[in-house]
Amino acid sequence: MTDKPTLHPRNRHQGRYDFPALIKAHPDLARFTITNPYGKPSIDFANPEAVRVFNRALLKAQYGVQHWDIPADYLCPPIPGRADYIHVLADLLAEDNAGDVPRGAQVRALDIGVGANCIYPLLGHSDYRWRFLGSDIDTTALASAKAIVQANKLDKAIGLRQQTQPKHILAGLLQADERFDVTLCNPPFHASREEATRGSQRKWKNLGKQDPKRKLPVLNFGGQNNELWCEGGEIRFVSQLVGESVQYAEQVLWFTSLVSKASNLPGIEAALKKAGVKALRIVEMGQGQKQSRMVAWSFHDDAARQAWHARRKSQA
């Protein structure tokens, strides 16, 4: 029996949350703070407004993000798990960089599906000072992300771009002269609206809050359709990303995606083999009851990846 993965060692969210520090950073959190059955301060994670205010406090206290908000009905992400993905990406880049995590604006990351919350660019820039380009098909999400970027004066660190061809992921998005050290993606994992609704209801029930007459809040469990589901579900989305990545093989060092369902891995690995990748990594991730993994692939062999890092250093 293997141990379940825990938070990455560099993750800032080890142990219990420091509620006094969070309330000091964002006093509005105090009105949502409750005492849990173990006598510890917490919030009602079934209350969307509480989750949003909690995230705002966490981003301010831990990451220096002074202004953060999202529109109603958009995903309110659990920050520790999102931070883990960033740290795993950093380890991936360190692998071919003599074990050193590359930092600074010379490192460029592409966040596919940046969302209204803009969470990955905020965390990645705060922890490693990387530059990000965030893409999305949703104009409302992009407007929200832009407001966050501008309010925090991060325009030089975080760019945003609309994918105007919603049936494509990379095609039509990237310019021929752009280079990215890594791409990241947290894909929609349901195959239909009905499946997504059932998933939200399961989470709601697990909190003991299910009420058939009550509309389910969507801030922390749901999101917009394109955030939650796509035709064919997670495996189709990631397989399409693999297929499209072939065209951009020379422009990106590592392509990556989260995969929530382990049963999808064989199909994704088959797509990667067909694409002719030179390197493949699967890294298990998890916190609490939620388990996931990052799949990463590159069309560059070991020597080419090391040369990529050397070129970036020479241009710094």
Swiss-Prot record:
Keywords: Cytoplasm, Methyltransferase, rRNA processing, S-adenosyl-L-methionine, Transferase. Pfam families: Methyltransf_10 (PF05971). It comes from the Bacteria. Gene3D superfamilies: Vaccinia Virus protein VP39. It is found in: Cytoplasm. GO terms for biological process: rRNA base methylation. The keyword Nucleotide-binding does not apply. One of its GO terms (cellular component) is cytoplasm. Its EC number is 2.1.1.181. The keyword Ribonucleoprotein does not apply. Specifically methylates the adenine in position 1618 of 23S rRNA. Belongs to the methyltransferase superfamily. METTL16/RlmF family. This is Ribosomal RNA large subunit methyltransferase F. It comes from Pseudomonas entomophila (strain L48).
